[in-house]
Swiss-Prot record:
Pfam families: ABC_tran, cNMP_binding. One of its GO terms (cellular component) is plasma membrane. It comes from Mycobacterium tuberculosis (strain ATCC 25618 / H37Rv). Belongs to the ABC transporter superfamily. It comes from the Bacteria. Keywords: ATP-binding, Isopeptide bond, Nucleotide-binding, Transport, Ubl conjugation. A nucleoside 3',5'-cyclic phosphate binds at residues 210-330. GO terms for molecular function: ATP binding; ATP hydrolysis activity; transmembrane transporter activity. This is Uncharacterized ABC transporter ATP-binding protein Rv0073. ATP binds at residues 40-47. The complex is composed of two ATP-binding proteins (Rv0073), two transmembrane proteins (Rv0072) and a solute-binding protein. Disulfide bonds: none annotated. One of its GO terms (biological process) is transmembrane transport. InterPro entries: AAA+_ATPase (IPR003593), ABC_transporter-like_ATP-bd (IPR003439), ABC_transporter-like_CS (IPR017871), ABC_transpr_LolD-like (IPR015854), cNMP-bd_CS (IPR018488), cNMP-bd_dom (IPR000595), cNMP-bd_dom_sf (IPR018490), MacB-like_ATP-bd (IPR017911).
Length: 330
């Protein structure tokens, strides 16, 4: 089993004609035998990253190396072999076949890999016993609790003993007793040389992680001094899909606010002049920037943290910012 290395990963997709990058320049190194938690709210790129690691989604650029093999370059039979033998995925919705029993669900990847029916059933029974479902193996998913279904999904994911396990929100929709069962099982999976990557927004899972990766940075609200930025015409202040912690107010010149489109073009949203501000929504809600901003002419802008913006410019609560209320005079 090997190490996992993610190098300058960029994932881009299109929504409503606009280009979005939920993952933009991610770098991450994970040693074999590690349990990694991807922490962040919905929409921050956790599931997108798991899809790339699983060979389901191809990134725009960058590399994902597992055991020294760049999986972003795999195609055809090599990619199919990676998906079947190198990675196991535990989906948030379990993805169990309703008409099959627990043991039959676990047998699916084994049979697909060419194992005989007798051997695959024996292996499936061993796995279900390992996750404490020996007495429920002949029950269909509809007769199992949420926690039991999740354990069947885990047993299926490790059926071919893959060195990489990916789990997407494994504690979603489970009660506290079921959560405890799943947490213990996931921790056991990372023992040895296997790499386990878990996407979650559940902070209860963090203590058992070897490493926590915050996909949405937790910017601290501070009263640090405003940052003045001078740009020449054509220079970019920030790019669409990047993260930031400053709200900008134009003091001189003009800035273009543009959406990057799926066809590589741009859509002008607004020209901001002296007294205008922009970039507040992403900062307030810890979202990626929704547009690219560049100087239309030689221009100057001042960047404020949320707290400094409220205090120094007379803006009160979130509603004032979201409704883009006019700024008070200094």
């Amino acid at each position: 089993m090997g190490d996992l290395s993610i190098q300058n990963l960029v994932v881009e997709y299109y929504s409503g004609g606009y280009a979005l990058r939920p993952i933009n320049g991610l770098n991450l190194d994970v040693a074999a035998g590690s349990l990694v938690m991807l922490l962040g709210p919905s929409g921050c790129g956790k599931t997108t990253l798991l899809s790339c690691l699983g060979g389901i989604l191809r990134p725009k650029s960058g590399a994902i190396k597992f055991d020294e093999v760049d999986i972003t370059t795999l195609q055809g039979a090599e990619l199919a072999n990676y998906r079947r033998n190198k990675v196991g995925i535990v989906f948030q919705a379990f993805n169990l076949v309703p008409s099959l029993t627990a043991v039959e669900n676990v047998m699916v990847p084994l049979r697909s890999a060419g194992m005989s029916r007798r051997a695959s059933r024996r292996r499936a029974e061993e796995l279900l016993a390992r996750v404490n479902l020996a007495e429920r193996m002949n029950h269909r998913p509809g007769d199992l609790s949420g926690g039991q279904q999740q354990r069947v999904a885990v047993a299926r994911a490790i059926a071919l003993d893959p060195p990489l396990i990916l789990a997407d929100e494994p504690t979603a929709h489970l009660d506290f007793i079921q959560v405890e069962e799943v947490l213990r099982l996931i921790r056991e999976l990372a023992d040895g040389e296997r790499v386990v990557v878990v996407a979650t927004h559940d902070s209860r899972m963090l203590p058992m992680a070897d490493r926590v990766v915050e996909l949405t940075p937790d910017f601290a609200e501070t009263n640090r001094p405003p940052e003045t930025v001078h740009l020449q015409a054509g220079e970019v202040l920030f790019e669409q899909s990047t993260m930031g912690d400053l709200i900008y107010v134009v003091s001189e010149g003009e800035f273009e606010i543009v959406h990057e489109l799926a066809d590589g073009g741009e859509e002008l949203v607004k020209v901001a002049g002296p007294g205008d501000y922009f970039g507040e929504i992403g900062v307030l809600f810890h979202l990626p920037r929704s547009a690219t901003v560049r100087a239309r002419s030689d221009a100057t802008a001042v960047g404020y943290t949320v707290q400094a913006f409220r205090e120094r410019l007379g803006v009160g609560g979130l509603r004032d910012l979201i409704e883009h209320r006019a700024l008070a005079n200094d």
